[in-house]
């Protein structure tokens, strides 16, 4: 009698939810019992815990990761007439934040080894209008922050971390979120530290910046009905803060499991048609995404899907070829490395609670592919 094939979803929250069921239900009950839903003790407790975790003085909760970046830019006074350097290979929210602040994005190519921005290309993109560098820690690995910070210091620029995919990642022993002037995090449910809905935060050591960000996210108010900025409504609600506080003590263990899965992938996948990702020296990769490259990407995806293995693409169309950014005037071929990644990248299953059989099924299917 033949064995039932092992199916592997691209992602599943079920193992984590089962393990933390009592904690999450307790968090919900606690918020309901308190009958306080915005700006209360749960928010304050999580902000302190996450600031301590990242090794910074301040964490300011907000509505989502995009808002976190927008609030940082606005609090820094970056807006119309200014330019912000950002990687060409990233999720569109990175660049949308720059646009929402009124500034202009300047896209710089990544390295194929790291998928992160190439510091060797940043200097040439700096102009008199440049005000900041947006350093994205893509897929869970920190950008080369020493080089980025050195360039920023030489030109008087701010450094903003987009840490939406890098909860718990480290660079030379320091946590993502503590490596620039400020960092934006997303707590979208699929993140390594995810809420049960949308949520985000900003981390920083800058006292004045944190105060401005908190006011900007609360209608520009420093105290009730007193508005010193033209702000917006972007706050971390009590329920999501309570859920995040329940999950945070488990983040390192969950990241360690992702690293264990990634280690097996890296050690046991040996298909010459598939280029595996790398953990760079000085970095602790938390493997939010396990991104491989394959010239026959679509065929590989079809092969894996036919075997019950879920996949995704991060990201199938680069920023400069999206209709939303036609204004940049960058045609196909303008940013060849971002285009190569978008045409060849495939994301393999990676989530807390994958069974050994599921991990083995992914490895076997990749190795069996004839590209």
Question: Where would I find each of the regions flagged by the language model?
Answer:
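PLP-dependent aminotransferase class I/II
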Residues: 3, 14, 26, 41-48, ...
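Glycine-rich phosphate-binding segment of PLP-dependent enzymes
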Residues: 3-6, 15-37
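Phosphate-binding glycine-rich loop
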Residues: 35-83, 96-101, 107-109, 174
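Structural detector of well-ordered beta-strand residues that form the stable sheet scaffold
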Residues: 60, 85, 106, 159-160, ...
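PLP-dependent aminotransferase-like
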Residues: 74-163, 170
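Hydrophobic/aromatic ligand-binding patch that stacks against planar heteroaromatic rings
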Residues: 96-98, 151, 175, 192, ...
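Conserved active-site segment immediately N-terminal to the catalytic lysine
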Residues: 161-196, 224-228
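Short beta-strand-to-turn element immediately C-terminal to the catalytic PLP-Schiff-base lysine
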Residues: 185-186, 200-205, 245
């Amino acid at each position: 009698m033949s064995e039932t094939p092992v199916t592997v979803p691209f992602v599943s929250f079920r193992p984590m939810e089962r393990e933390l069921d009592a904690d999450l239900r307790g968090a919900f009950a606690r918020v309901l019992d308190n009958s306080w839903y915005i700006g209360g003790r749960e928010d304050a407790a999580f902000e302190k815990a996450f600031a301590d975790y990242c090794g910074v003085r301040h964490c300011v909760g907000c509505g989502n990761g995009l808002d976190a970046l927008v609030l940082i830019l606005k609090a820094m006074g970056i807006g119309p007439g200014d330019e912000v350097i950002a990687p060409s290979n990233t999720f569109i929210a990175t660049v949308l934040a720059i646009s929402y602040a009124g500034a202009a994005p300047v896209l710089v190519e990544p390295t194929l080894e790291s998928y992160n921005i190439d510091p060797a290309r940043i200097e040439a993109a700096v102009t008199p209008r440049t005000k900041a560098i947006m350093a994205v820690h893509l897929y869970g690995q920190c950008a080369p922050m020493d080089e980025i910070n050195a360039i920023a210091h030489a030109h008087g620029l701010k450094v903003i971390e987009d840490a939406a995919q890098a909860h718990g990642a480290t660079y030379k022993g320091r946590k993502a979120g503590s490596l620039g002037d400020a960092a934006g995090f997303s707590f979208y449910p699929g993140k390594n530290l995810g809420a049960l809905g949308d949520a985000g935060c900003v981390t920083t050591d800058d006292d004045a910046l944190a105060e401005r960000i908190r006011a900007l996210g609360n209608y520009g108010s420093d105290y009730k009905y007193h508005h010193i900025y033209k702000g917006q409504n972007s706050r971390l609600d009590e329920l999501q803060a309570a859920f995040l506080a329940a999950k945070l003590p488990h983040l390192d263990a969950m990241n360690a499991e992702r690293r264990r899965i990634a280690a097996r992938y890296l050690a046991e996948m040996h298909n010459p048609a598939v280029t595996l990702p790398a953990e760079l020296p000085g970095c602790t990769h938390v493997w939010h995404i396990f991104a491989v490259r394959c010239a026959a990407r679509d065929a590989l995806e079809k092969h894996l899907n036919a075997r019950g293995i879920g996949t995704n693409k991060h990201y199938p169309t680069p920023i400069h070829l999206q209709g939303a950014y036609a204004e940049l005037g960058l045609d196909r071929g303008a940013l060849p490395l971002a285009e190569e990644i978008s045409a060849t990248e495939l994301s393999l299953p990676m989530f807390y609670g994958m069974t050994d059989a599921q991990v083995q099924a992914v490895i076997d299917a990749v190795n069996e592919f004839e590209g």
